[in-house]
């Protein structure tokens, strides 16, 4: 019996190639976009090296400095503010100050090399868990002495030194020469907080003007909590520090709004008023519903075209349940084929993103669990889009069906 259903289903698919193509395209595209989006999400917010403790790492990414005249400035904080009001916090296990990553140009044997550079303190290597391939991190002593030492990633090591060991060799960064003390695995650019090609001590910057920057700067402060239970205590202690701020120029700015957050919460607060997870959930539901509505319309048109077939089968004794089951099997089979195409498509899209270097050092992988969830949803929506019109048409009188009855 099932074999006959499958034979009929494949005959229908081949006879109505356009409807089959549209249905498969809608199912495959929906799954591909869903899986790729989840892979990107996981790459940004998931616990991956060196940000393996994302659930208890908080960062002051931005501050909002407000003046008495209603003027305000929003962006990364200055080093002076973070050094004075986050470094002394006692609740965190560790506090690290580090700059945003900025591009710098170097030359090697006359070849121009663009490198992302990040200035960090010694605590940075405690907060984040980098995989050292050679050497190790620079120390507090290096930071105190403004030593020109650098940690670089493996790609930068290959660009400057080929396959030879980089340890102890000199590399030009930001028009200064640094001695390489460590080589780490590449960090994807999507790891916004820790990403760079090279990391050097903050104190080794060419200009010391950064020490006077207060509300306007290019620095973050990352706090490692001892446990998740300490996060509310960190927030409370930081609020206490904000209440005691001594403003350099109260006539210009007399209030600062800031909060140490996870990256997910920071993006949620700034872009979605704290509702990022809700916004993403709504977007996913809408994204899945649109192809469903499209499939319903396609199925209604397809079933209407088969009204005469339904009429003939009913005239020869086919009951409503048999007809509905036929359409259900067709829809499930179509969804499974679409899922297989999506599986291949996901691998292809993720491979292209990785191979083209569109996202530096990204290694996006197929999340099978998310793919299976998406496939189950696709099967559910496939059933939803096919059962109702099939059931309505199966209820028609044979004569009415032969006349092309309306649903």
Where are these regions (language model features)?
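Mid-to-C-terminal secondary-structure elements
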Residues: 123-137, 148-271
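Short cytosolic juxtamembrane segments of multi-pass membrane proteins
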Residues: 390-407
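Transmembrane alpha-helical interface segments in multi-pass membrane proteins
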Residues: 18-29, 293, 308-354, 369, ...
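Short amphipathic beta-strand/extended segments in non-transmembrane regions
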Residues: 61-62, 77-137, 251-255
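A hydrophobic alpha-helix feature that marks transmembrane segments and, especially
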Residues: 282-310, 389
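Short, strongly hydrophobic transmembrane alpha-helices
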Residues: 16-45
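Membrane-proximal extracellular/periplasmic loop immediately following the first transmembrane helix
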Residues: 37-105, 215-220
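Membrane-helix entry/capping segments
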Residues: 3-4, 11, 15, 243-283, ...
